[in-house]
Regions:
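Polybasic, low-complexity association/targeting segments
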Residues: 1-25
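Acidic-glycine-rich active-site phosphate/pyrophosphate-binding loop
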Residues: 6-11, 38-55, 122-127
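Active-site flanking loop/helix segments enriched in acidic
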Residues: 16-27, 36-42, 130-134
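A short glycine/serine-rich beta->alpha loop
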Residues: 19-26, 56-65, 134-138
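Short cysteine clusters
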Residues: 31, 67, 116
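Phosphate-handling active-site elements
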Residues: 42-52, 79-99
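DPxDG-like acidic metal-binding loop motif
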Residues: 72-80
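C-terminal binding/interaction regions
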Residues: 96-175
C-alpha cells in the first residue's frame, strides 16, 4: 500500500520552519535537533524519542564528520517517507533512497560541503576548540547554515509533493 504524505497547505510553512530552526539553534544548540524539531512542530509530529535519537548527531556526529544539516534532512525524509517496520524489507527502503541522495547533493551545493569540519574549521572532538567556536562570531555562520538548510529541505519536500513523489510504503499495521 502506498500512502501519500501531505505537507501543510499554506505557503508560509517553509519560512516558519527556517526561522524556527534558526531560533532553536541560537537558543538551544544542536544543528540536527534544531532543524528536526522545527519540522516536527510544523508537521504536527510529537514524539520526544525522535528528538532524543538525534541527541549525538550535532557537530558532525560529535566528531566533525557529516554536517548536522544533512543528517537532519535525512531524518526528516525518514520521518515522512521511511519504512514503519523492518519487516517491510527493501520495499520499505526504496521510496526514501533516491530522494535522500538528491537532497544530500542539494544541501552540499547550498552549504558548500557536507563536512562539518570543512564548514566550521573545528575539530569538535577537541573540547577547547569546540568551546572557542561556540563563543566566537564564527558560530553565526552555523546559525545561517541551519536556517538555509531547513529552508532547502522544505523546498525539496514541496517539490517532491508537487512531482507526486512524496509517499511511503505502508506496513501491514499502517493505517
Amino acid at each position: 500500500m502506498v500512502d501519500r504524505v501531505a505537507l501543510p497547505g499554506s505557503g508560509g510553512w517553509i519560512p516558519r520552519v527556517r526561522e524556527r530552526a534558526h531560533e532553536n539553534m541560537r537558543r538551544h544548540e544542536s544543528c540536527t535537533q534544531s532543524i528536526l524539531a522545527s519540522f516536527m512542530e510544523e508537521l504536527g509530529i510529537r514524539d520526544p524519542w525522535v528528538i532524543r535519537s538525534a541527541g549525538a548527531l550535532h557537530g558532525g556526529l560529535v566528531s566533525s564528520y557529516t554536517c548536522g544539516v544533512h543528517i537532519a534532512g535525512a531524518m526528516v525524509l525518514g520521518l515522512l517517507m521511511g519504512r514503519e517496520e523492518l519487516e517491510q524489507g527493501s520495499d520499505g527502503l526504496f521510496p526514501v533512497v533516491f530522494p535522500a541522495q538528491e537532497l544530500m547533493g542539494r544541501l552540499t551545493r547550498k552549504l558548500g560541503s557536507h563536512s562539518c569540519r570543512e564548514l566550521t574549521g573545528v575539530d569538535f572532538t577537541d573540547l577547547n576548540q569546540a568551546i572557542r567556536y561556540l563563543a566566537s562570531s564564527e558560530r553565526e555562520k552555523c546559525l545561517e547554515r541551519v536556517a538555509d538548510g531547513a529552508e532547502e529541505i522544505g523546498l525539496f519536500l514541496k517539490e517532491l509533493e508537487e512531482r507526486g513523489e512524496l509517499f511511503r510504503v505502508g506496513g501491514a499495521k499502517s493505517s
